[in-house]
Amino acid sequence: MIASIHFDPPVIAHRGASALAPENTMSAFLRAVQLGIKWVEFDVMLAGCGTPIIFHDETLNRTTSGRGNVAEYSYAYLRTLDAGAWFSPLYAGERIPSLEEMAQFLVATGLRANVEIKPLPGQDEQTVVAAWNVMSAYFPEDSPQILYSSFSVPSLKCLRHLAPTSLMALLMHEWDPKWLQIAETLQCVSIDVNQDILDPERVREIKNSKRLLLSYTVNNPDRAEQLFSWGVDAVFSDNPDQIARFC
């Protein structure tokens, strides 16, 4: 079941190198490349017009100069917002990327990506279809460069229908005793788990299923070392350079 996915170093830049640059922006992803990180993670949701964009929150308030719900605005408007000044004046003028822009960046750099499908309420399937329409124009269905993940089982079901050979991961924030049943049904090659709910027994349980085990969000090198010693394959981190230094 384990896919032909390799993590060297075993760290994934969470929303890019988001401790060093504003999360889910091209500057954060470029910073990851500059640090020698091979994998990034980012979130995909839909703007009000249906364009898939790279953004995490349902609202604009935390990470942009805008206010209100993402779903209320077209991408043409969202593109005018400042997505960097909240982090540092050095990043003033940073824009919200589209998934298309990100896909082109992945092709140009060879960077690998964990693409988290993060649908707004009621958009589980719609988000997958829009995201797949973009990604399939740039990558083969079974590309080892791309791992799709989601907390949304309906989204994963939709993706499996659209792309039978795509590499998928089930995200778990709280422990779900039915995780194996879900993973087998959806043919997930990886389980991506909140580090706070992991212990050696649960790590063994997942690894015994012959799947990859990724853990988030790990910013402490000592904690990363512990997780690796238990058998975790890679960790998501806001400061991937610090984790990679100890790998």
Where are these regions (language model features)?
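Phosphate-group recognition and catalysis centered on beta-loop-alpha active-site segments
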Residues: M1-C247
